[in-house]
Amino acid sequence: MSEPEKTDSVETVKNTIKSTQLTTEHAKKLTQVVNSIPTILSKLDNSEYDEIFGHRINVDSKKFVDVAVRNEILLKFLAADEYDVELATKRLIDTLNWRNKFHPLSAAFDENFNKALNDLGAITNFVGLKSDNLNVVTWNFYGATTPKKLFEEYGDNAGTTTNQRPGSQFLRWRIGLMEKSLQLVDFTDPKNNKIAQVHDYNNVSMFKVDKGMRAATKEIIKIFGDNYPELLSTKFFINVPSLMSWVFTFFKTIGVISEATLKKFQVLNSGNLTEWFGKSNLPPTYGGDSKSSMKELNVASIKLSPYGEYILEELGKKEIEDVIDEVE
């Protein structure tokens, strides 16, 4: 009979957190979540799936568990629900179940997507910026293709991968972009434990947005809101027509967008981002003087965490076994 896993003290848990100064009350709440990990895992659809953002969410003694990183990730879930342990626990269970079903690491590191999709985005990793949590950025170039054509080919579950992963190719590509970017953050570093997003609407009509694009955007917003808490530092909306800029303020007035969320938004009529990222980091398209294009600035090779690699290896083995079972 195995011995019960020892519980962590409030002081021990508090000392692992480097991203912020935890109050004693918040540290107590986080300790509750940490010590309830076995219970959380027991309530999952698959109790063996314990990965979030490529890191193992399990008890201290398990292989691959980085206690400090694990606790920082758990803290994000807790903070997103205003330190309500019950709500945070439910969010964790839902996220682990979603990851077990969706396999976002596969979308990021195993699956191949059409060039039309890959041209829609990029990931940059700048250094030496004056503001925190702007180092890692995901870029979305909505004008890179025709939305109608894009969603006819890659939306609404069209052209899903051969092993029938959940979601459309567009959704899996976009989630994969997010997952890749998270491998570049340091969850223990208050200056680099979040990412920024740039949404470039150059050449996109804000009045004739394709219905497929609207539906996909709505789905992605929900998935990110549910499963990627406290990971966004700033969201830039650039090349937005002047006539549309008032919409964000209007949403705030009627309560659709909260004050906290609105503070993360930067809505620009132009594409000049030098105030935040500096001229030397950006190509002329975004106000800079770098001779590198966005394609060249894109971080093409991103290494997955050791536990993430292990998860993908196990997933591959399971799929091979499933194929063998079908043949037999």
UniProtKB/Swiss-Prot annotation:
One of its GO terms (biological process) is regulation of exocytosis. CDD domains: SEC14 (cd00170). InterPro entries: CRAL-TRIO_dom, CRAL-TRIO_dom_sf, CRAL/TRIO_N_dom_sf, Sfh5. The keyword NADP does not apply. Residues 129-294 form the CRAL-TRIO domain. Heme binds at residues 142, 174, 199, 201, 235. Pfam families: CRAL_TRIO. Non-classical phosphatidylinositol (PtdIns) transfer protein (PITP), which exhibits PtdIns-binding/transfer activity in the absence of detectable PtdCho-binding/transfer activity. Regulates PtdIns(4,5)P2 homeostasis at the plasma membrane. Heme-binding protein that may play a role in organic oxidant-induced stress responses. This is Phosphatidylinositol transfer protein SFH5. It comes from Scheffersomyces stipitis (strain ATCC 58785 / CBS 6054 / NBRC 10063 / NRRL Y-11545).
